[in-house]
Amino acid sequence: MTIALGRFSKEENDLFDIMDDWLRRDRFVFVGWSGLLLFPCAYFALGGWFTGTTFVTSWYTHGLASSYLEGCNFLTAAVSTPANSLAHSLLLLWGPEAQGDFTRWCQLGGLWTFVALHGAFGLIGFMLRQFELARSVQLRPYNAIAFSAPIAVFVSVFLIYPLGQSGWFFAPSFGVAAIFRFILFFQGFHNWTLNPFHMMGVAGVLGAALLCAIHGATVENTLFEDGDGANTFRAFNPTQAEETYSMVTANRFWSQIFGVAFSNKRWLHFFMLFVPVTGLWMSALGVVGLALNLRAYDFVSQEIRAAEDPEFETFYTKNILLNEGIRAWMAAQDQPHENLIFPEEVLPRGNAL
């Protein structure tokens, strides 16, 4: 009896193996299978944004100037959302709205849907890139899990919220001042700052900043001296194998400061991961609620008492009046197609007027 020893070999010219070998080859910039999604989508999203902010007006969608060509600067230029009348149309270049006319497509706001969708898939591609690389070098996938938080915020704000409203028109435009205007809109129409999910998001982001500052300062404070350089960057060898800071010293320091301290690095770093990621996830969940017009906290008893008693006022009732003012002024400006006209007596007036 003859026994053949060896490994079963597939056909040499297997297309998948050829692609896999080329995509995952060790090179300066890793491509990978995720790169097939990431690089084209990121290229188109950034290219669309630069094109829109440089050349394309928002006159036909918002009645605004929004490009460098019209005199805007980096803070005021934007790729603006399509008109409200276009509802949730994908605004494909070859669709019934633009009918293949690139100029008309830009005028209708087609670049916004182009940037939003390619941007979302580009971010997802970047997360998959982290999964793929982590698997290749046998790391756990916590980087990718952490990056899911900003993806959740992007998708909820730019896609899910306008899908719950009457159209893409109510999403943020892609620009600095445009995002600020959207924040004011969220406050006036949804009382967003009093929403518990927003509160959790703020706690997560600011808490993460505090943790990051404390952690960096503590590590710097407890570094061992192993060189004669004048400063941190010259005194330490970045390629040394051993740790160069003292967890024990750091633990004792914070135990004396607060009475409690992290006892091991895994729990410390997991907490630094957990705080911002959970905060962003909660914030994204809150925006999904706003898409369905769920309300924030309402303290109706205070509103009723403030309406009946001119001497009773709280910071809450003052903010409610401010929100009414935002709605009254913003609705007419933001939605000129609705021909909203508010009588002078219903517009809020400051004490100086």
From Swiss-Prot:
Chlorophyll a ChlzD2 binds at H118. HAMAP family: PSII_PsbD_D2. It comes from Amborella trichopoda. One of its GO terms (molecular function) is oxygen evolving activity. 2 of the reaction center chlorophylls (ChlD1 and ChlD2) are entirely coordinated by water. It is found in: Plastid, Chloroplast thylakoid membrane. Pheophytin a binds at Q130, N143. It is an enzyme of class 1 (oxidoreductase). Chlorophyll a PD2 binds at H198. The keyword NADP does not apply. This is Photosystem II D2 protein. It comes from the Eukaryota. Keywords: Acetylation, Chlorophyll, Chloroplast, Chromophore, Electron transport, Iron, Magnesium, Membrane, Metal-binding, Oxidoreductase, Phosphoprotein, Photosynthesis, Photosystem II, Plastid, Thylakoid, Transmembrane, Transmembrane helix, Transport. Its EC number is 1.10.3.9. The gene is psbD. Pfam families: Photo_RC (PF00124). One of its GO terms (cellular component) is chloroplast thylakoid membrane.
